[in-house]
Every structure is written in C-alpha cells, then in structure tokens.
From Swiss-Prot:
This is Fe/S biogenesis protein NfuA. The lineage of its organism: Bacteria, Pseudomonadati, Pseudomonadota, Gammaproteobacteria, Enterobacterales. Coiled coil: none annotated. Involved in iron-sulfur cluster biogenesis. Binds a 4Fe-4S cluster, can transfer this cluster to apoproteins, and thereby intervenes in the maturation of Fe/S proteins. Could also act as a scaffold/chaperone for damaged Fe/S proteins. Binds 1 [4Fe-4S] cluster per subunit. The cluster is presumably bound at the interface of two monomers. Keywords: 4Fe-4S, Iron, Iron-sulfur, Metal-binding. The gene is nfuA.
Length: 191
C-alpha cells in the first residue's frame, strides 16, 4: 500500500524518539477522491489507534491508515530527500484524488484516471488542469484545459509533446488527442 524509504523511516524514528512511548505515525488523506484532496502524516499515540485502522509495519516504525484513506493511499511513497538546499519529506500519493481503476475498466475511466493521477499534478504547478470531455468513436480523446493552461501560448506543445505522447503510449487504442478549449488569453494564463 505505502512505501516508506529507509531515509524516511530513519527520519521518522528520530522524531518519534522524542514522543510518548509507543507513538507511531498516521498517514491520511483529507477529502479523499476529491480534486482538493490532501495527504498528511501525523503522530499517532497508542490511544489514537482505531480498531478499523490498517497497521503497516516497517523496520523502524508502524504507520497507521484509517479505512477511508486506505484505498486512496494505494501506491503512495514517502521519502526523505536531502540536497544542497537542505532536506525535506516528500509524500507522493497518485491515487489520493481518484481511486485507481482496474486494468479492464472502460477506456474513458482509465484515461480520466491517467489525467487526474499523472498529468494534472504536473499542470497544477502552473495553476492549470485538463479534463476529459469524451472519447470519440474514431478514438480521439477530447480534452478541455482550465486554469493557467487556458490561453497559455505553450498549450499546443503541452498537448502534443506532453499529454498526447503520454496517453498514446499508455493507451494504444487511442488515435490522438484534441483540444476543445476556447482559449482566452488573460491574467490567469501561465505564459
């Protein structure tokens, strides 16, 4: 369910050493399955463990996950990264905003999942997003851009070189991607 790197485990173990004995960590999702879903990690003292929690045992600690958050934390990764600027804890949860769909789910659901879990997190850095409007009988995914992508001068490059390449690679049954957006350049546009 959740992978916690050795570096992150060591970081948590150091923090937990200063807490009440038996305290572990809790990994959770606020607003799971929603576009504004957020993941978090908190201390979990022994008296805060619920009977319905899933206990994930690691070498240096145990991570508790509540039953509502569990499906949205599938394939989540926690790491502790150090670079020239310092160190930081990273939590990647590709399924937090949308549950992972089955490999045999309808094409529309699988493409929507790829957009929400892989593409929109990248576009969010520019205040943008993309939505799947339909998949035509000819096999074209019809997308609509919003936020900072609407009116952005780089949207064609993003569509053809980024999104289309990624979707065609992942879904060979697609023939291409089309943009339905009526782009209006403005203050909201990224470029």
């Amino acid at each position: 369910m959740i992978r916690i790197s050795d570096a992150a485990q060591a970081h948590f173990a150091k923090l937990l050493a200063n807490q009440e004995e038996g305290t572990q960590i809790r990994v959770f999702v606020i607003n799971p399955g929603a576009p504004n879903a957020e993941c978090g990690v908190s201390y979990c003292p022994p008296d805060a463990v619920e009977a319905t929690d899933t206990a994930l045992k690691f070498d240096l600690l145990t991570a508790y996950v509540d039953e509502l958050s569990a499906p949205y934390l599938e394939d989540a990764e926690i790491d502790f990264v150090t670079d020239q600027l310092g160190s930081q804890l990273t939590l990647k949860a590709p399924n937090a905003k949308m549950r992972k769909v089955a490999d045999d789910a309808p094409l529309m659901e699988r493409v929507e999942y790829a957009l929400q879990s892989q593409i929109n997190p990248q576009l969010a850095g520019h205040g943008g997003r993309v939505s799947l409007m339909e998949i035509t009988d000819e096999g074209y995914a019809i997308l609509q851009f919003g936020g900072g992508c609407n009116g952005c001068s780089m949207v064609d490059v993003t569509l053809k070189e980024g999104i289309e390449k990624q979707l065609l690679n992942e879904f060979p049954e697609l023939k291409g991607v089309r943009d339905l957006t009526e782009h209006q350049r403005g203050e909201h546009s990224y470029y």
